[in-house]
Amino acid sequence: MNKFSRTLLAVSLGVSCSCIVAAQEKAMGSSPIPRVLQITREFTKPGKAGMVHDKAESAFVQAMSRAKSPTHYIGMTSLSGKPRALFLTQFESFEAWEKDNQAVEKNAALSAALDRASMADGELLDSIDQGVFVFNEELSLRPRPDLSQMRYLDISVYHVRPGHNKDWTDIVKMVKDTYEKAVPEAHWGVFAQFYGGEGGTYLVLTARKSLTEVDRSFLDTKQFRAAMGEDGMKKLDELVAVSIESSMHNLFAFNPRMSYVADEWIKNDDFWKPKAAAMPAVAAKPATEDKKAKP
């Protein structure tokens, strides 16, 4: 599959949209799409992923729950690329983000609990970084904010060459217009990087109920190409070649043990109900004790 076809497949996005909702005083899944998206990436050390990391992250969830924080987030773990966990939180505005930070600072008990959790979690991590992105409604297609029934997230990262932002906009609009007509089920969200990374960085996100939707996206691509026609595909291919410097596509699985979601989600779907991390097996005691036995 050539570069353009791979890019096109990623932009096709299948069915459900990429709108991770965690807003001030609004339950995830019921609010409109917030504008500001904060993403924290945690790269785990070898052998420190899985339930070991889940247990450490559950301390953050418990701290937020005890404090009854109105700001929710979704945690997810990678199924491709370098082992890592992502934590996505959204706010209505940068002012709302500021108020959330101030509220945490003023809550001594919550701040202390988060500090303790961070120290324990840090022992498992190779590195950590954060990025802030802004939702672009114009380039998004039929985005849906409700992720309560979703289980996976596709994340495609595009780096646009300097001076080619208009070309990028033309590409996405061309793709959007055609998918809107040819593939009625298609949905996606586009976010532009605002802080924490290189300029010209865009995220195209899609949430999925199951991976069968990835299989269906191949058919969607065929329908798209047919609707574009030979001349349209040639023009699109040329724009992609001159404007997109690089792209990366990865898949993540939602992790309920790492997520702090609204009570509504937990009540309506067992997937989001907290589950205790597995405890190590305890060796059985001998029938009789030999006090002289050596350790």
Per-region residue spans from a language model:
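Short, intrinsically disordered, low-complexity terminal segments
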Residues: T7, C19-I20, Q24
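Short S/T/G/P-rich N-terminal loop/turn motif that feeds into the first structured element of a domain
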Residues: A22-P295
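Bacterial N-terminal signal peptides
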Residues: A10-S18
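Bacterial N-terminal signal peptides that target proteins for export
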Residues: M1-V11
